[in-house]
A protein has these predicted regions:
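A short, acidic, amphipathic alpha-helical segment used as a generic capping/interface helix at domain edges
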Residues: 247-264
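FabD-like malonyl-/acyl-CoA
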Residues: 2-141, 186, 190, 266-299
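Short amphipathic alpha-helix with an adjacent loop that forms part of the alpha/beta core around
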Residues: 301-306
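Alpha/beta catalytic cores of group-transfer enzymes, especially the acyltransferase/condensing modules
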Residues: 11-14, 38-40, 52, 101-249
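Charged catalytic carboxylate motif
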Residues: 28, 65-69, 171, 207, ...
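Non-catalytic positions within long, well-ordered alpha-helices that form the structural scaffold/packing
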Residues: 78, 180, 260-263
Length: 306
């Protein structure tokens, strides 16, 4: 019997009006925004449904808005009787994954992400940096460049031939230049406010720790694939992993391959956009991907699994 994994996107997968159609059609989805707004202390319905996309450039609001939208869409999918065997999240998407797997409550997940966004924004102000996507080089080549240049690190293993690096601005610039000399197809600076998933934001991990340590994690109803370790992890590890992920690279490629190796044949992207689905097609063409961000795509998912 085929297995299903729900994938939850990370920062950058936002869009104006995200989640509105599903929330207005499915009461369980609207309840997520209402509970999340109270937990985060911001009006997530107004932010997601009506604010321009530019409002999401602030990581402090983008993170809770994105996770709330992913969890609202998850509730809509679950209302159709569809449940995953596995969950996996890209960066902040791990908080949505754990909420969807019912290891933590939805308000707790969104409240934690609000604190995470505040912590990351503060760390980025204290120790500025940047990120860039290196396209068309092997992982080993990019890793070697980072070791040689210093103060720049691999941050996201997105798919074969696409690694994001993170670090001090000059070091990231040098890495881009050297990557192109090594034959990279492109080196693209990302529109982010800090050097996330690098040691430069270690203070964010320190600030987030007390909030994470207050949370009681239950055994998940769907197996949790960590993108910190690219392994299945149990509830005893979640606190440390959610703190560690702030400074550790996102091993999405490795995690997706591990899930495919465990028999997952359908990957469902739960959240705005289809970034992860696009990456999956470059990781393993034998699996099926479905993105769900509106009612039409929800119906498509039902047809796919019928």
């Amino acid at each position: 019997m085929s297995k299903i994994a729900f994938m939850f996107p990370g920062q950058g997968s936002y869009e104006a009006g995200m989640g509105r159609e599903i929330a207005e059609a499915v009461p369980e989805a609207m309840e997520v925004y209402e509970a999340g707004s109270e937990a985060a202390g911001i009006d997530l319905k107004e932010l997601c449904f009506n604010a321009p996309a530019e409002a999401m450039l602030d990581t402090k609001v983008q993170q809770p808005a994105l996770v709330a939208t992913s969890l609202a869409i998850n509730q809509a999918i679950r209302s159709r009787g569809i449940a995953p065997d596995y969950v996996v999240g890209h960066s902040v998407g791990e908080f949505a994954a754990l909420g969807a797997a019912e290891s933590i409550g939805i308000p707790e997940a969104i409240g934690l992400v609000r604190e995470r966004g505040l912590a990351m924004a503060e760390a980025a102000r204290q120790h500025p940096g940047s990120m860039a996507a290196i396209l068309g080089l092997a992982d080993e080549v990019v890793e070697s460049l980072c070791r040689k240049i210093q103060n720049v690190w691999p941050a996201n293993y997105n798919c074969p031939g696409q690694i994001v690096v993170s670090g001090e601005d000059d070091a990231v610039g040098e890495c881009c230049t050297e990557a192109e000399r090594e034959g990279a197809r492109r080196a693209v600076r990302l529109r982010v406010s800090g050097a996330f998933h690098s040691p430069l934001v270690a203070r964010a991990a320190d600030r987030l720790r007390p909030a994470v340590e207050k949370i009681q994690f239950s055994d998940p109803r769907a197996a949790f694939m960590s993108t910190v370790t690219a392994k299945l992890e149990d509830a005893s590890r979640y606190r440390e992993l959610l703190i560690e992920q702030l400074t550790a690279p996102v091993r999405f490629t490795q995690a997706a391959r591990e899930l495919a190796g465990r028999g997952v044949t359908v990957f469902v992207e739960v959240g705005p956009g289809n970034v992860l689905s696009g990456l999956l097609k470059r990781i393993d063409r034998s699996v099926r991907t479905v993105s769900v961000s509106n009612m039409s795509e929800l119906r498509e998912l039902e047809e796919t699994l019928a």
